[in-house]
Amino acid sequence: MASIRELHQQLIKKERSAVEITTEALDRIEKLEPLLHSFLHITADQALESAKKVDAKIAAKEEIGLLEGIPVGIKDNMCTQGIPTTCGSKILENFVPPYESTVTQKLKDSGAITLGKTNLDEFAMGSSTESSGYQVTANPWDLSRVPGGSSGGSAAAVASEECVVALGSDTGGSIRQPASYCGVVGLKPTYGLVSRFGLVAYASSLDQIGPFARTVEDAAILLGAIAGYDPKDSTSLNVEIPDYTQFLKPKLSKLKIGIIKETFGEGLDPVVADTVNQGVEQLKKLGAKVKEISCPRFRYGLPAYYIIAPSEASANLARYDAVKYGIRKEADTLMSMYTTTRASGFGAEVKRRIMLGTYALSAGYYDAYYLKAQKVRTLIKQDFEQAFEEVDVLVCPTAPTTAFKAGEKTDDPLSMYLSDLMTIPVNLGGLPGMSIPCGFDRLGLPIGMQLISNVLREDLLFQVAYAYEQATDWHKRKPPLPQ
């Protein structure tokens, strides 16, 4: 499937209609879903109706925006009015939101065509999309492997060309890690740049919505459409949103890039290390000045995250009590209704994190765990602040390995958690981070390179990512799927 700008040109030149583009995407979904299981809900009728409206505008010689008529996928933890929003959980299997999230409303207003809701780890808690209460999504590059998580459905849908772009959410790497595993571009914006209103909360101080795309330009276009201040979100930043495509330049002269020393240590697959180092060499050729940077507290990100995030989750998920929405298991007393419903509605990983968080917040352990984790978070932020006094952009691997086999880590939570080792500190710092394809391993599995910039410096990420993309062809490779 073509890029956003290419499809836009085809539409305005009347080479193709929006209905034709939408039908092509829906046909591809129908063909690939038995293999991939990327989507939980497909909204074919609404998509075709929206496409007809775009075609009517074109027929009336009205101008159309860049996203009008462009097929998109939405992670199923963003509320969509009249369309099921399950968060990949059985506890919300019958939930149809009465309102629209800010980001999906912005996409509607931009004329984008929503094809459906994509699969995810239950309540976005996971790194493989295997904890979904409904289905396991496959990696388009190797159907026996995971697409990453928690936004695995969106990553797989974009990589397999079921849709042009998609939205995901990122709490500890849930956009960037699956982007790496699936060989696409994935961006976690600065915390507060994109409204969280209507995003079902996992860890409110860490969650952020962002784009998946096959090209850097498409990611820039999609971010421009969803970013911006929202009075409905108290953490929303009131800043001017630029046209991010203006930063897409092919050279990197005078740009200073830092390689995070601590990310090239124990646990990193040597092939991933070599591939990312080759990516760094390419950045040098493009004119960037590269130096090694130390972020000594980076390695404490994982344990701090797995106290802070579950603590916030234990509070956020207390609302699922079977009273106003979601499934309800009948019982003799109110308390037993709560416990029976939650016991049957939540999956194992969600229960594990609720228990972890409740323990960390309990009276006897609050200072020893939660408060200490927040202090570590502050130290990690200080590491980043010091690094950005010396360089413009930081570079490291997105994930320690390529995609692992389905079922390989389901019985070993710690091993699963380690796949977010490189991405978690970025969320703790509230910084923007982007994964871009930078090569493949011997099995033909994609490898991602992570770019990190200071708060609200997405412009630098787009500049570096675009220059690298234009000098390489990794983003042009396609997974071995039926065409």
Swiss-Prot record:
Residues annotated as the enzyme's active site: 75, 150, 174
Annotated catalysed reactions: L-glutamyl-tRNA(Gln) + L-glutamine + ATP + H2O = L-glutaminyl-tRNA(Gln) + L-glutamate + ADP + phosphate + H(+)
Alphabetical keyword list: ATP-binding, Ligase, Nucleotide-binding, Protein biosynthesis
Gene Ontology molecular function: ATP binding; glutaminyl-tRNA synthase (glutamine-hydrolyzing) activity
Any one biological process term the GO annotation gives: translation
Domain of life: Bacteria
Coiled-coil segments: none
GO cellular component, one term: glutamyl-tRNA(Gln) amidotransferase complex
Pfam family, one: Amidase
EC number: 6.3.5.7
PANTHER family (alphabetical): GLUTAMYL-TRNA(GLN) AMIDOTRANSFERASE SUBUNIT A (PTHR11895:SF151), TRANSAMIDASE (PTHR11895)
Family from the record: Belongs to the amidase family. GatA subfamily.
Role: Allows the formation of correctly charged Gln-tRNA(Gln) through the transamidation of misacylated Glu-tRNA(Gln) in organisms which lack glutaminyl-tRNA synthetase. The reaction takes place in the presence of glutamine and ATP through an activated gamma-phospho-Glu-tRNA(Gln).
Subunit structure, as described in the record: Heterotrimer of A, B and C subunits.
Name the record gives this protein: Glutamyl-tRNA(Gln) amidotransferase subunit A
Gene from which the chain derives: gatA
